[in-house]
Amino acid sequence: MKSVKDFLNKHNLTLKGATIIVGVSGGPDSMALLHALHTLCGRSANVIAAHVDHRFRGAESEEDMRFVQAYCKAEQLVCETAQINVTAYAQEKGLNKQAAARDCRYQFFEEIMSKHQADYLALAHHGDDQVETMLMKLAKGTLGTGLAGMQPVRRFGTGRIIRPFLTITKEEILHYCHENGLSYRTDESNAKDDYTRNRFRKTVLPFLKQESPDVHKRFQKVSEALTEDEQFLQSLTKDEMNKVITSQSNTSVEINSSQLLALPMPLQRRGVQLILNYLYENVPSSFSAHHIQQFLDWAENGGPSGVLDFPKGLKVVKSYQTCLFTFEQWQCKNVPFEYQISGAADETAVLPNGYLIEARHYADSPEEHGNAVFITSEKKVRFPLTIRTRKAGDRIKLKGMNGSKKVKDIFIDKKLPLQERDNWPIVTDASGEIIWIPGLKKSIFEDLVIPNSDRIVLQYRQHEKCRGQAKS
């Protein structure tokens, strides 16, 4: 009880007149928290229990719910419950069961907070949980706020989440239950080695407690220091990213990569994390600091243009000083690129739209190639060739036609989607003459009667594993 009072005083929290939702599983931690808050507040606050049956353990799960309901009835407490098919939710969302259970719980808690216009959601995470969480994050390579573990107080729903037990241990909670004659339910799955947290709890935590009995307090101090440092760095990062971000929508963010890479590394990492937090509804559990560093290395050293795949369908499209983070299917807004075909050897240019252009010397031309193949020679056009995006005023001298035609009009005639036009490849020779619009139109500079010994065959085709970088 003293620990709860100390927690409330430290964080300047007043429970008098408040509505407090308590997440109650029926286990010793949540039963102790419900009892402590009810005893502390009496009738000066409205304490409400909220229980979720995840339906993982059949009849046992339902018995947990009945146990919580019976306790609340005896204590004259309101009890809100929900039975959720978490397994089905996990399959639908592509999540593991633990992540799915957490999603379902917090969605339910938010609904109950809204229903009662609650001020607080009290959760029974304790000091041992905090140590486990921070170690698991560290082992995964998490940086920034995530490494600080669970926050003692944070905004949520109509109010705030509070975790009054973060400075006490599981052993102290069990002692409180025994001292106050509290019954509780036991979840046998907490003893299984199937879950990462359980393995940390059974192997790592006992060693740390043996070395330092107050390890939970030390970790909590580290957590608070990391949080304070992170808040300062986040503030700096937001100021700098306002200069780095050039445009954004609900599904995409475009940045100037040169300006990002000019920032100190701690701000670079946090800048990318801010973008991810903005774009992802929930950052995938598979995401780690490795992905952020991978992006930064690629942005600096990966060539002028390309595409990087992130989890859950997020792509980063790079073109010179621009990087576009997007969930859109190639609806890339004005992402220019430019590659060269020297003509000296067989070459391949891989394009950001998922296609490539191959240049092959002395090759036989396909029997039916249409506009996806262009045949020429160094006698017919001047090398090097350039593959680029369109420019204002572009015109092409079409095969079988007098004069020239605007590239813009060709795109309109072909009903090319507006979002694809700025990224459609155009091939020019060394003088800047447009010789080919791959897949759409050819110029007068194609020659089908060139001998094999002189011919260069250009082919435009789809490439599934696009990474958008020219190579020879």
UniProtKB/Swiss-Prot annotation:
Its main location: cytoplasm. This is tRNA(Ile)-lysidine synthase. It catalyses: cytidine(34) in tRNA(Ile2) + L-lysine + ATP = lysidine(34) in tRNA(Ile2) + AMP + diphosphate + H(+). ATP binds at S25, G26, G27, P28, D29, S30. GO terms for molecular function: ATP binding; tRNA(Ile)-lysidine synthase activity. It comes from Bacillus subtilis (strain 168). Belongs to the tRNA(Ile)-lysidine synthase family. HAMAP family: tRNA_Ile_lys_synt (MF_01161). PANTHER family: TRNA(ILE)-LYSIDINE SYNTHASE-RELATED. Its EC number is 6.3.4.19. The gene is tilS. Ligates lysine onto the cytidine present at position 34 of the AUA codon-specific tRNA(Ile) that contains the anticodon CAU, in an ATP-dependent manner. Cytidine is converted to lysidine, thus changing the amino acid specificity of the tRNA from methionine to isoleucine. It is an enzyme of class 6 (ligase). SUPFAM superfamilies: Adenine nucleotide alpha hydrolases-like, MesJ substrate recognition domain-like, PheT/TilS domain. It holds the Pfam family TilS. The N-terminal region contains the highly conserved SGGXDS motif, predicted to be a P-loop motif involved in ATP binding. SMART domains: TilS_C. It is found in: Cytoplasm. Keywords: ATP-binding, Cytoplasm, Ligase, Nucleotide-binding, tRNA processing. The keyword Lyase does not apply. One of its GO terms (biological process) is tRNA modification. InterPro entries: Lysidine-tRNA-synth_C (IPR012796), Rossmann-like_a/b/a_fold (IPR014729), TilS/TtcA_N (IPR011063), tRNA_Ile_lys_synt (IPR012094), tRNA_Ile_lys_synt_N (IPR012795), tRNA_Ile_lys_synt_subst-bd (IPR015262). GO terms for cellular component: cytoplasm.
